[in-house]
Design a protein with these regions (language model features):
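Histidine/acidic residue-rich metal-binding segments in metalloenzymes
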Residues: 1-59, 73-85
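Aromatic- and acid-rich polysaccharide-binding/catalytic face
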Residues: 60, 64
Length: 140
């Protein structure tokens, strides 16, 4: 989607990528700009005309793509690299792989040591923002 130019043509489009966890994002986002730019330049390669983007590839991850995770501590620990604005914890209820009835325990284990403000974003504020739910939270 990124290299097709979709997000250049539709900059406000937001896509939620669900049900495959997100601990891998830190590595991908870190590498995608390098693979697209400096590495190609170092080897004398240029970007194909049909793959030229208006922004660095990583910017589309932050602007257009949102990711969910269930029981994925690596995803929570990746927030310093990827950022905390496009991650969302998910229970996957009612599917067989869901975290219910242990969702609260899994969230606590997954987010152990994470700043409480980041945890709030991962567990409720980001989904509220993505879907424009307009919910107000009066709890810590």
């Amino acid at each position: 989607m990124i290299f097709s130019g979709l997000f250049d043509r539709h900059p406000k489009l937001k896509i939620a990528c669900t049900e495959f966890d997100a601990g891998w994002l830190g590595v991908i986002v870190q590498q995608v700009d390098y693979q697209y730019g400096p590495k190609k330049a170092a080897h004398g390669n240029t970007v194909r005309e049909d793959m030229k983007l208006e922004l660095p590839p990583s910017e589309y991850f932050h602007r257009n793509l949102w990711f969910t995770f269930l029981d994925d501590r690596a995803a929570a620990l990746t927030t310093p690299i990827f950022g905390e604005d496009n991650y969302m914890w998910s229970s996957d209820y009612p599917h067989a792989a869901c975290t219910w009835p242990y969702s609260q325990q899994i969230v606590e284990r997954t987010c152990q040591g994470i700043d409480p403000a980041v945890k709030r974003k991962l567990c409720r504020e980001n989904v509220n923002k993505l879907y424009n739910l307009g919910l107000e939270f009066n709890c810590a």
